């Protein structure tokens, strides 16, 4: 189910609080740019019913099923990439601070009192958007609502300043001061909310910042016109939300700006939710979920954040730049089977040596690696594993005069009849390798780490010939020119190739509940250092 209309129908039903009929759905579709009538809607609903994605409730209409909700989260990756940005802009307009605000939500499993105390620690340290919060116990779960940072964007808009949301990421703190973005994802380049991605993959350390001033805090990066600088600074003095970490006109916490921009770094509205999550409490976190009357929220004590003009220690660059640089170091020769390859690395505690090696072998036997070669070495504390990175294949093609452009990395859903990406991030729109972001989502069976490359369509025959000579398990699918591949759009005069992620063997180790510290694009080594997986 990857039709845009089907996705929109599921979206309409998911947002409804009661069953919805075909007429209301048709009207809602027209508001969203789809001019189809009730009869056509009924046809789509019939198909959705047959696939158990919706359920008919007599004359009342349809409701979305659990399977439908799950499908909505996966379907039509090209439709969802960039939708995070468009939703942010829409909600920026619909908000009306200080009366109507946009909230984030989370559901935790655990003790109400303990979770509440943890969330309030973040507020008291100042790491929240505003001083409003709802936290309630519902059965065995604790629900938490915090203000979204888009609320501040709405505040700027109401004061005549147009903000442009660009990135979500994590900011490194030293001695209680923000020093640099450690990682960012462009809202326009991702199928998933950047802050949710960083939080759920364990990339934050808000507790560390609260307790000793060292750690990583979720943050958003906006730009505003440079001509509004004086007006912006006046607004900051009366800012009731007190959520600006830093701002400036040059290298703001490592982020590049053009001469007509001011960069603004906002603490993420999800930050208070990180404290219980980092403490091990199971969480279901959603960003910018709904608009709410601020009068229905409770005021809490909030520590003061001082907005500072601050440059970063280093400039944040997209991972694509690193990939293209590393690609140049690859000189593996297909005929001689000699030369440099790029490897990913994993560090596993030595007490898990036997289990880790078994998991690695299992991955290779199931063709979840680039080739049949890897390197394993042990010291007193760790087993260190090295697997060939998928970038090596790009480098091999480049050495043979075929320009291969890394495009997206993400999670590929693998079924007998179809393969499709269910999450993806553009390599040009992130400073972190997407496979690091999605590492915990791979299960080595139904969901694997994979990537998309773009190649000129005139190079199709030569690429296929070289791939056969290479003889590796690197390419999952070769697309047709001017056609989507695994649900991802490829431009005119190009074709796509889907490549298996070189970190899948490490994801298989993690799936077996073995702790693993993983790095992508780690270094170049000589192919002769690698051995067949049977020999490790």
Curated annotation (Swiss-Prot):
Residues 315-536 are annotated as: NRD 2. Coiled coil: none annotated. Keywords: DNA-binding, Repeat, Repressor, Transcription, Transcription regulation. Disulfide bonds: none annotated. The keyword Protein biosynthesis does not apply. Residues 7-72 are annotated as: Winged helix-turn-helix. InterPro entries: NRD, NrpR, NrpR_dom_sf, RNase_R_HTH_12, WH-like_DNA-bd_sf. It holds the Pfam family HTH_12. Changing residue 195 to A: Decreases response to 2-oxoglutarate. Gene3D superfamilies: mj0159-like (3.30.70.1360), Winged helix-like DNA-binding domain superfamily/Winged helix DNA-binding domain (1.10.10.10). Under nitrogen limitation, binding of the intracellular nitrogen metabolite 2-oxoglutarate to NrpR decreases the binding affinity of NrpR to DNA, leading to initiation of transcription. Residues 80-314 are annotated as: NRD 1. GO terms for molecular function: DNA binding; identical protein binding. Disruption phenotype: Disruption results in slower growth with ammonia, but does not affect growth under nitrogen-fixing conditions. Changing residue 435 to A: Decreases response to 2-oxoglutarate. PANTHER family: GLOBAL NITROGEN REGULATOR NRPR. Homotetramer. Binds to a single operator as a dimer and cooperatively to two operators as a dimer pair. Transcriptional repressor of nitrogen fixation and assimilation genes. Binds to two tandem operators in the glnA and nif promoters, thereby blocking transcription of the genes. Belongs to the NrpR family. This is Global nitrogen regulator NrpR. It comes from Methanococcus maripaludis (strain DSM 14266 / JCM 13030 / NBRC 101832 / S2 / LL). The gene is nrpR.
